[in-house]
């Protein structure tokens, strides 16, 4: 089983959720659903319960201005998130508001966090210095040095199509320890495009306007080729990383999806 650690299943681009899940099962891909505010967290919860998978509940930094975090009480909620900082789009939420809402969520002292960091690395790491938890910085688009700081903090790094957009991203992947990597589509966004530096590392590219969880194999193929390792070695390591991060509740999902 492969885990897509980020699927925005509540996005309107998913016209037929049942069909998406069917494709996932055929491809042996388990998607984890992302909440970005209370409404999407609740919807992700409902989908996770319906399809025997997991979800995150949280407030995305871009929704910090008009959101109040309310925990969704469900054993399907595997982490708080998506939460963090995003300084690329400050028109949606100010820096101070983002920091405040981020800290509110960190103060919940959850076991795991699904984290967002865009153009905000220094403030992001400064805030995290006061906390210790399991976490993954998803959709990583930072530098090699930034990735090293994140790994030193004991966090995983999520790689998707946007992570492979330019040559800096390729260097990041080359330098990442295998035991620090988790993979994601962030569907329906972040598909590898033909203009991306990572495109040349995908042998079996599928042309789609929107991304889908079952296309996670493009990311896996690209990482294996960038790091020049056999794909089965990468798959085995990703399985170990996923179980290390998500624990027994993910293993339970594996059992149900194999039925």
Curated annotation (Swiss-Prot):
It comes from the Eukaryota. Its cofactor is a divalent metal cation. A divalent metal cation 1 binds at residues 82, 186. A divalent metal cation 2 binds at residues 82, 116, 138. The keyword Phosphoprotein does not apply. It is found in: Nucleus. Binds 2 divalent metal cations per subunit. It comes from Vairimorpha ceranae (strain BRL01). Its main location: nucleus. GO terms for molecular function: 3'-5'-DNA exonuclease activity; metal ion binding. Keywords: Hydrolase, Metal-binding, Nuclease, Nucleus. Putative deoxyribonuclease. The lineage of its organism: Eukaryota, Fungi, Fungi incertae sedis, Microsporidia, Nosematidae. Its EC number is 3.1.21.-. This is Putative deoxyribonuclease TATDN1 homolog. Belongs to the metallo-dependent hydrolases superfamily. TatD-type hydrolase family. GO terms for cellular component: cytosol; nucleus. Coiled coil: none annotated.
